[in-house]
Every structure is written in C-alpha cells, then in structure tokens.
Amino acid sequence: MGVANDSSPEYQWMSPHRLSDTVILGDCLYFNNIMSQLDLHQNWAPSVRLLNYFKNFNKETLLKIEENDYINSSFFQQKDKRFYPINDDFYHISTGGYGIVFKIDNYVVKFVFEATKLYSPMETTAEFTVPKFLYNNLKGDEKKLIVCAWAMGLNYKLTFLHTLYKRVLHMLLLLIQTMDGQELSLRYSSKVFLKAFNERKDSIKFVKLLSHFYPAVINSNINVINYFNRMFHFFEHEKRTNYEYERGNIIIFPLALYSADKVDTELAIKLGFKSLVQYIKFIFLQMALLYIKIYELPCCDNFLHADLKPDNILLFDSNEPIIIHLKDKKFVFNERIKSALNDFDFSQVAGIINKKIKNNFKVKHNWYYDFHFFVHTLLKTYPEIEKDIEFSTALEEFIMCTKTDCDKYRLKVSILHPISFLEKFIMRDIFSDWINGGN
C-alpha cells in the first residue's frame, strides 16, 4: 500500500486506505477507534410497536418514575450547569446546514450527508485535504491557526442517523402526549412539538423520564437530546423533503475549547484579554495573518474559505508564544489561547478545485470575498465593536457595499483587492498590542 504525499494538491485524488466502497484519509487508528464505538447498522422495531409500548403508561405511572431518585445528568442540555457526561457516549453538540456534530471524549465527530448524484466521494474531500495541504506547506507559526482533521471516512452509509432521529422524535412525541393525557399518535405539528419540547427540556422531572425511556426505547450510545431542536430543523426542513439520507462522510477533529462566537465580555476577561473588543481584534488579526501567509505561497493566491465567520473559528489552548513574521515586523501572541480556522467544506486552494464552490460562484473572488463576509458577521455577532470608534470605522472599509452587490453579507460582484490591502490594514496602531510584541 502506497503512502500519499499530503503536501501535494493531488493528495485529494489519492486513496491511501480502502474499505470496499469506502475510503479513509488520514490516521486509520483514530478513525477505526471511533468507528468501533458506533453501530452503523442499528435498527429498531416498527414505530407502531413503540406506540403500543407507550400504551402501557399513563400520567400516574409517569409520576412514579419522576419520584425516583435516579437521574442521568447527560440528558440535561449541555449549556445547563446540571449537565454531566456520565457515560462514554456520543453527545450531539451541533447541527448546521451541512453537518451533524458529536463530541466523544476529546474528539469531535462530524457526519456530512453528501449529494452523491452531484459529486463523487473523492470530490467531497476539501474539508480534509485543503487544511492538510495548507498546514504542510506553511512554514511558520501561522500553520498553528488551522484546524486539521485527524481522519476522514468517505462514502459511508449514514442512514442510521436519520433512523435514530426518527426513533427519538417518536419517543418524545409519545412521551409528551402521555404526560399531557392526550391520545397517542405519531402525527405531529412542527410548531406544536417544538413548543412542547422546549418548555420541558430543562425540567428535572422531564430529564428523569428521559433517563428511564431513552435507554429502554433508544438503547444507543448516541445521545441526541442535546440541541435536539437543531436536529429537528435539519431533518424537517422543506428543502430536504425528498432527500435521501443514504451516504456521506465521517470526519474526526480535535476538540476545541469554544467556537469564537461563544466568547462574551466575561469569558474574554477570563481568557486574559483587557476587553471583548481586544479579543475581537485578536481573532481578526490572527485570521488576517493566516490569509496573508497563504497568499505568499506559490500558486495559492486563489485561496477561498467561502464561509469565514466567528462560529467557524475555534479556540484552542496555546502553550507557547505564536510569532509570525511579515516584512520587517513580527507579530507576537502571548495569549494562552489561539484561534484556528475550521470547516473547509467549501474551500479551494492551488490545484484543489472544489466543485461545490465552483458551481455556486458566478464571478471570480479572492480573499476580499471572505473578509467582506467576516466583517459583516463580526459586527452582527458583536455590536460592542461600535464602542471602539477607531476599530469600527476601520472595519467599515471592508463593507462598502450596497444591496445590488451584496446579498446576506455575501458579495455578488467581483472585487479583487490585492492582498497588500490586508497587509497594510494590520500594520495600523489598532493592532499595536501584538506588533513587535507590543513594543
């Protein structure tokens, strides 16, 4: 078996490890360790049998369960202080438009359903190959500002996730109906169900019921109760009415401390920043330096992330200073955290052309497209920026747009400012805390 050189753009077309019709990129040990804890073939009895099962319960029997002392604290929502992961389970932490994300131990596992009729499995590898290519070609500390997946499995059968979701949804429907003394039915209104679930999810009595019924009815080490409403919105969205939840990719990442958008004033101070605005300058500067260094690489001036925003920037511990040299300056970061760019699903660089982005963009773009969107999302996420007149005024230079050339913060026209625009921008006194170590 050959070894692929992942510093080459052609790496994405190679298949280092094959498993029948599946492919594993990266570290097989990490991947197989995670896969050994998943049952991709688990299925359940027909839903009508679940309905008959719940006919054995009524409001009185549920009250007796609620009176028990036993409670599995992993069924609280993760933002609840009472939440505690008592088992080595997969805990749902996020569902977005393109992936369902779980945490297990110190790993993050992302499942992505792919449109197999539009792309071959090897055309969906950008989330692994682009950051790996950049990491291996960048020479300085800037490479530390990239999140690289440890492993990626292509073309795996993922129907179990949709089946699991439906099983949990039906359990919750029947449980809530029993609590309310209603006639049992698997029919539901999205608005009514979400209202009922959101009203109960933080209740200790409801968590006691989940502690009883989830193991009995679901019997899985995948806990989707956390942020279940996000999963509901994903699977129930009208645009996926006829979607086939058949195959996709499984990606394994290191576990971050937070995503950048989760930091508020209190947490920024706790992390060692003088203010929330200083923290925002910190992540902006690190991302700007990363882009500048990427654009210095041969043939990489076509790099696009295509979704640069605070929740796609992750924060990790930083145990040593990060020093990045640019012309006659050096930028020194002594903070105990670092920011790192994540989620390269729609990215492209050098010879790695991403069909997803190619099909979506009608005009040519460069780094400015990403930073135009980034600044818009920063200002939306952090209105506190306006209190710093100098910083907010400077950021306005990235969003001098109108409704005709910008839609939902995304440029519709081609504006190809040279990367020197960004280089000059970060040399301003706004970032003096880090230029030459703050001296």
Curated annotation (Swiss-Prot):
It is an enzyme of class 2 (transferase). Its EC number is 2.7.11.1. The keyword Ribosomal protein does not apply. The active site is at 307 (proton acceptor). It is found in: Host endoplasmic reticulum; Host endoplasmic reticulum-Golgi intermediate compartment. InterPro entries: Poxvirus_ser/thr_kinase, Prot_kinase_dom, Ser/Thr_kinase_AS. GO terms for cellular component: host cell endoplasmic reticulum; host cell endoplasmic reticulum-Golgi intermediate compartment. It holds the Pfam family Pox_ser-thr_kin. It comes from Vaccinia virus (strain Ankara). Keywords: ATP-binding, Host endoplasmic reticulum, Kinase, Late protein, Nucleotide-binding, Phosphoprotein, Serine/threonine-protein kinase, Transferase. This is Serine/threonine-protein kinase 2. Residues 87-439 form the Protein kinase domain. Essential serine-protein kinase involved in the early stage of virion morphogenesis. Belongs to the protein kinase superfamily. Ser/Thr protein kinase family. Poxviruses subfamily. Its main location: host cell.
